[in-house]
């Protein structure tokens, strides 16, 4: 059996889910630190919207080998985030401790 590299890639939905889970964790930590009340930053579908967030900056690292994420899915994630009120920049880099490849996201509210 021959498996093409596209069959081994992470789906857009899985990439979006991983990103949203990581961002939700960052927002929860931020809320604890700031001890500020604001409206729920997630819409009814569980996607992060940022609509009611005060200004904040979040850093997210996802340990995913680069060959498992297509440029198309990454670009779609960045576009969808911008449509939801977030400014997201991404960069591939190696973890300094483990040498594992990871994607780094810098997330700010627009």
Regions found by a protein language model. Give the residues of each.
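N-terminal leader/targeting segments
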Residues: 1-71
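Short, well-ordered helical secondary-structure segments
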Residues: 2, 73-75, 94, 100
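A short, charged, amphipathic alpha-helix used as a generic interaction element across diverse proteins
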Residues: 31, 74-84
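C-terminal edge-of-domain segments
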Residues: 80, 85-110
């Amino acid at each position: 059996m021959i498996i093409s590299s596209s069959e081994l890639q992470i789906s857009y939905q899985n990439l979006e889910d991983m990103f949203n889970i990581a961002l939700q964790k960052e927002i929860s930590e931020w809320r604890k630190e700031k001890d500020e009340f604001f409206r729920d930053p997630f819409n009814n579908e569980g996607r992060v919207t940022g609509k009611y967030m005060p200004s904040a900056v979040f850093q997210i690292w996802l340990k995913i080998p680069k060959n498992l994420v297509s440029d198309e899915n990454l670009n779609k994630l960045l576009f969808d985030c911008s449509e939801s009120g977030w400014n997201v920049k991404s960069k591939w880099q190696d973890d300094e401790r483990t040498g594992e490849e990871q994607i780094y996201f810098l997330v700010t509210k627009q």
